[in-house]
Amino acid sequence: MSIQISETLTFECETGNYHTFCPISCVAWLYQKIEDSFFLVIGTKTCGYFLQNALGVMIFAEPRYAMAELEEGDISAQLNDYEELKRLCFQIKKDRNPSVIIWIGTCTTEIIKMDLEGMAPKLEVELGVPIVVARANGLDYAFTQGEDTVLAAMAHRCPERDLLIDENKVIQNQTIQNIFSLFSQKKKEETLKYLELKNHPPLVLFGSLPSTVASQLSLELKRQSIQVSGWLPTQRYTDLPSLGDGVYVCGVNPFLSRTATTLIRRRKCKLIGAPFPIGPDGTRAWIEKISSVFGIKTKGLEEREQQVWQSLKNYLNLVRGKSVFFMGDNLLEISLARFLIRCGMIVYEIGIPYMDKRYQAAELALLRNTCREMCTPMPRIVEKPDNYNQIQRMRELQPDLAITGMAHANPLEARGINTKWSVEFTFAQIHGFTNAKDVLELVTRPLRRNNSLEDLGWTNLIKKDNKIKVI
């Protein structure tokens, strides 16, 4: 009996509500990434409670973020918003002296029409500290889009690339080559290697990653003779990369479509549409795409990928043949599904709150090719999924694992479906060759837990009524 496998991806769109964290949660990782910044969230008590509980850091501990709490006087326009924000920002400058203050707008600032963009330039002149305004409110599709909003706002603050300066650098490099006789042999080799790496247009990568992961990706590109000119965001606001005509940019996360649009339209950069460096297959495709744009032939990438797959053998034996269902939460679903299919899993459905098909075109193409290579059915992709309909489909399909938001995890577990919180993939280190193990560690944890319970014989839930004797 022959099984016919669909050759194309199926896209559907339902009319469900968005079930996700508030995008102001981006403060959790961005304030740690941009070390000389201060985030001021302008919202209500609800926003403060969310930040305090979700981030696990007490506001009273004075981290590098704070709440500007709106009161009844602000909402009824009895107070002067500008004067109140001015007082707070001067206090922040006195206490913390940041290089940049980032205002995070919320739902309330949208509803009462606070003109944050109008107030920021005026206050910036008085304060002497740059103020970046980002509207990371709950009107977005997914909580990860908070980072997208902040990076899009910061892209406007990146310095303009000066072609004259770049030409002067070339002249200086040529002068250095002319006086090589003054250098040692080791110094000559280092300088030649540097000049060789710079023999391509500037490359800026955008997306917030831990410093160790960003260094790993930069090193992987350096092995292919590609030098990364800068990252957006940087660890220090004062080190933002230069942008402009002739600068190539490439994203590392699938939820940064707004930033990509800003870089293309406003800063005139050239976007490299590549799959995202999640999993060994995605990382290899990401490097190959960047190399092909610069006309550089890759070397040793296939062997590097095979080494990683070899090191994951124990995990692959556990997940091979298992099925997974993505309910949709953080916009990482397409990349994770592609990687898990490559690991031998069957993906029934990819629920995703929203997808920019232009920005994720390369990722979708790689997903399609991976399904053909692994001879597995093409998963259905459902935008804005309705959770009620999803539950009905899961009852029929009975997947081995459901990757879902925190709100649905316990109800699904009670119905006998293994779950994994999708938010964990957001905070885990999942990019690059070396972090593929962490992805599979998260995916296999529920499966390994169940295997351990079966070994103990704990397979049935037994309810026993104890009769209490009254003496």
Swiss-Prot record:
Catalytic activity: chlorophyllide a + oxidized 2[4Fe-4S]-[ferredoxin] + 2 ADP + 2 phosphate = protochlorophyllide a + reduced 2[4Fe-4S]-[ferredoxin] + 2 ATP + 2 H2O
Binding site for [4Fe-4S] cluster: C22, C47, C107
GO molecular function: 4 iron, 4 sulfur cluster binding; ATP binding; metal ion binding; oxidoreductase activity, acting on iron-sulfur proteins as donors; oxidoreductase activity, acting on the CH-CH group of donors, iron-sulfur protein as acceptor
InterPro entries reported for this sequence: LIPOR_BchN/ChlN (IPR050293), Nase/OxRdtase_comp1 (IPR000510), Protochl_reductN (IPR005970)
SUPFAM superfamilies listed in its UniProt record: Helical backbone' metal receptor (SSF53807)
Amino-acid biosynthesis in keyword set: no
Swiss-Prot/TrEMBL keywords: 4Fe-4S, ATP-binding, Chlorophyll biosynthesis, Chloroplast, Iron, Iron-sulfur, Metal-binding, Nucleotide-binding, Oxidoreductase, Photosynthesis, Plastid
Pathway of action: Porphyrin-containing compound metabolism; chlorophyll biosynthesis (light-independent)
GO terms (BP aspect): light-independent chlorophyll biosynthetic process; photosynthesis, dark reaction
Cofactor binding note: Binds 1 [4Fe-4S] cluster per heterodimer. The cluster is bound at the heterodimer interface by residues from both subunits.
Keyword 4Fe-4S in record: yes
Superkingdom per UniProt: Eukaryota
Co-factor(s): [4Fe-4S] cluster
One GO CC term on file: chloroplast
Major location category of this protein: plastid
Protein location: Plastid, Chloroplast
EC number(s) reported in the record: 1.3.7.7
Enzyme class at the top of the EC tree: oxidoreductase
Subunit structure as annotated in this protein's UniProt entry: Protochlorophyllide reductase is composed of three subunits; ChlL, ChlN and ChlB. Forms a heterotetramer of two ChlB and two ChlN subunits.
Family: Belongs to the BchN/ChlN family.
Function noted in UniProt: Component of the dark-operative protochlorophyllide reductase (DPOR) that uses Mg-ATP and reduced ferredoxin to reduce ring D of protochlorophyllide (Pchlide) to form chlorophyllide a (Chlide). This reaction is light-independent. The NB-protein (ChlN-ChlB) is the catalytic component of the complex.
Protein name: Light-independent protochlorophyllide reductase subunit N
Species in which this protein is naturally found: Anthoceros angustus (Hornwort)
Organism placement in taxonomy: Eukaryota, Viridiplantae, Streptophyta, Embryophyta, Anthocerotophyta
